[in-house]
C-alpha cells in the first residue's frame, strides 16, 4: 500500500492537472454524479448541504455553504446537530441550519434559494429518495456517494464541480503537511497496532489496514494489523471494519497496542476493565488509546482531530 502522504501528494498532482484544464472558469460545466448528470450554469455562490457527512469537506475547500442539514444532537455534535469537528468553522462562516434531525424539508430547501444542493447517495443523511422532487422543483442537485471514497477524492470531485479546484488541492496539501509535522513528534510502537470499534451499538469490529483510519495511522508511521486470518470465517459483516462477535474479540486483539474507534477515555476504561480482555497484552500493559469521538468518519477536520489524539497518545519523550 502507498503511504498516505504519498497518496495525498498524488491526489494533489491530479487536481493541479485538472485545475490547469478548468481554471479558465468556463461555465456552464456539466458534471456526472451518483444520480446522473448535472449542468451547472455558473459558479455556485449559495450552496446548501443535505448531508452533514459532506459539509465538513465543503467547508474545507472553502465552498460558499449557506445552510446544512443537522443530525440529531449527540456526543458527536454540538447542540444544533452540527458535527463537532466542523461546527465552529460553520458558525464562524454563518452557516445556518437547513433542517434538524435529518428530517428532510423541501420547503426549507426551496426557501434557502440555493443555486446548488449537495446530497448523498448513501447513509442516514441520504435524500436520494427525494431527488425527483428536488429536480422537479428546479433545485440543481449534485449527488455524491461517500461510501467508497476518501475525503480527498470527494474534495477533488466537488472541487471540479464547484470551480474550486485550487481550494481542494490546498486542503489536501494542508492536511498532508499537518500529518507530516505530527509524525515527527510521535514514537510509534515497535509492533503493529489494532483499531477496534468496541461496543458501538453493541457491536464489535476491527479496522482493516486500508480503512481511512488505518491509512492515517500508517501515514503517522504506525503499522496496522487487521483481523487475524484464522478469524475470517467468523466475520459477520464487512466494510472498512470487519465485524465479529464479542466472544471472538479476545482472539481478534493480538497486538500490543490498540486504538479505539470513536473512543474516549471512558471507552478506554471500559475496554481495560472488560474481563474477557484481561489477558490481552494491550490491556496488561495499558496500551489502549482513544481516537476521539469524531474518528468514526474521516474528513479534513475529524482527520486532524484523530492525528492530534494519536500524537498525544504516542508523544515522543
Which role fits each region the language model picked out?
Residues 37, 126-202, 296, 300-317:
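Extracytoplasmic substrate-binding proteins
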Residues 73-78, 125-129, 145-157, 192-219, ...:
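Extracytoplasmic ligand-binding site segments that recognize negatively charged/polar headgroups
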Residues 154, 160, 248-317:
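Structured C-terminal subdomain patch of bacterial secreted/periplasmic proteins
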Amino acid at each position: 500500500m502507498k503511504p498516505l502522504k504519498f497518496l495525498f501528494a498524488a491526489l494533489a498532482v491530479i487536481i493541479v492537472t485538472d485545475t490547469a484544464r478548468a481554471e479558465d472558469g468556463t461555465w456552464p460545466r456539466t458534471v456526472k454524479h451518483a444520480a446522473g448528470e448535472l449542468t451547472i450554469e455558473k459558479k455556485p455562490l449559495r450552496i446548501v448541504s443535505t448531508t452533514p457527512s459532506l459539509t465538513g469537506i465543503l467547508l474545507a475547500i472553502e465552498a460558499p455553504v449557506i445552510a446544512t442539514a443537522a443530525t440529531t444532537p449527540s456526543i458527536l455534535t454540538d447542540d444544533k446537530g452540527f458535527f463537532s469537528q466542523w461546527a465552529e468553522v460553520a458558525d464562524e462562516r454563518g452557516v445556518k441550519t437547513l433542517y434538524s434531525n435529518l428530517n428532510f424539508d423541501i420547503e426549507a430547501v426551496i426557501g434557502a434559494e440555493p443555486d446548488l444542493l449537495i446530497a448523498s447517495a448513501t447513509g442516514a443523511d441520504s435524500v436520494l429518495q427525494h431527488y425527483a422532487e428536488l429536480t422537479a422543483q428546479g433545485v440543481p442537485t449534485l449527488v455524491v456517494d461517500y461510501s467508497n471514497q476518501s475525503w480527498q477524492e470527494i474534495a477533488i470531485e466537488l472541487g471540479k464541480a464547484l470551480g474550486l479546484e485550487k481550494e481542494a488541492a490546498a486542503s489536501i496539501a494542508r492536511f498532508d503537511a499537518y500529518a507530516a509535522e505530527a509524525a515527527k513528534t510521535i514514537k510509534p510502537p515497535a509492533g503493529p497496532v489494532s483499531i477496534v470499534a468496541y461496543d458501538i451499538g453493541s457491536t464489535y469490529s476491527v479496522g482493516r489496514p486500508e480503512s481511512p483510519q488505518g491509512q492515517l495511522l500508517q501515514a503517522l508511521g504506525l503499522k496496522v494489523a487487521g483481523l487475524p486470518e484464522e478469524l475470517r470465517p467468523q466475520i459477520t459483516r464487512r466494510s472498512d471494519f470487519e465485524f465479529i462477535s464479542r466472544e471472538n474479540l479476545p482472539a481478534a486483539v493480538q497486538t500490543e497496542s490498540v486504538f479505539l474507534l470513536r473512543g474516549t477515555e471512558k471507552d478506554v476504561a471500559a475496554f481495560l476493565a472488560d474481563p474477557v480482555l484481561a489477558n490481552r497484552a494491550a490491556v496488561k500493559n495499558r496500551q489502549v488509546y482513544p481516537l476521539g469521538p469524531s474518528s468514526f468518519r474521516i474528513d479534513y477536520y475529524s482527520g486532524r482531530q484523530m492525528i492530534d489524539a494519536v500524537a498525544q497518545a504516542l508523544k515522543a519523550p
